[in-house]
């Protein structure tokens, strides 16, 4: 169950990243990495 939520969240982050990347690639990439790291820490336990 948690794995499914984690996958769906990652897909949403990826979609958002692709949209933001057109504007400012460096900043959006760092933001997504931070969010992914935070989510992986939450769901990794």
Curated annotation (Swiss-Prot):
Changing residue 38 to W: In TetraF2W-RR; important increase in activity against both Gram-positive (including MRSA) and Gram-negative bacteria. The keyword Membrane applies. Has potential application in preventing biofilm formation on medical devices, since it has the ability to prevent methicillin-resistant S.aureus biofilm formation on the polyethylene terephthalate (PET) surface, which is widely used in making prosthetic heart valves cuffs and other bio devices. The keyword Signal applies. It is found in: Secreted; Target cell membrane. Pfam families: FSAP_sig_propep. Residues 11-35 form a propeptide. Transmembrane segments: none annotated. The modification Phenylalanine amide is found at residue 43. One of its GO terms (biological process) is killing of cells of another organism. Keywords: Amidation, Amphibian defense peptide, Antibiotic, Antimicrobial, Cleavage on pair of basic residues, Cytolysis, Hemolysis, Immunity, Innate immunity, Membrane, Pharmaceutical, Secreted, Signal, Target cell membrane, Target membrane. It comes from the Eukaryota. Its main location: secreted. Belongs to the frog skin active peptide (FSAP) family. Temporin subfamily. This is Temporin-SHf.
């Amino acid at each position: 169950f948690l794995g499914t939520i984690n996958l769906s969240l990652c897909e949403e982050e990826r979609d958002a990243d692709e949209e933001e990347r057109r504007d400012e690639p460096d900043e959006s990439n760092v933001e997504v990495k931070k969010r992914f790291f935070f989510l992986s820490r939450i769901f990794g336990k």
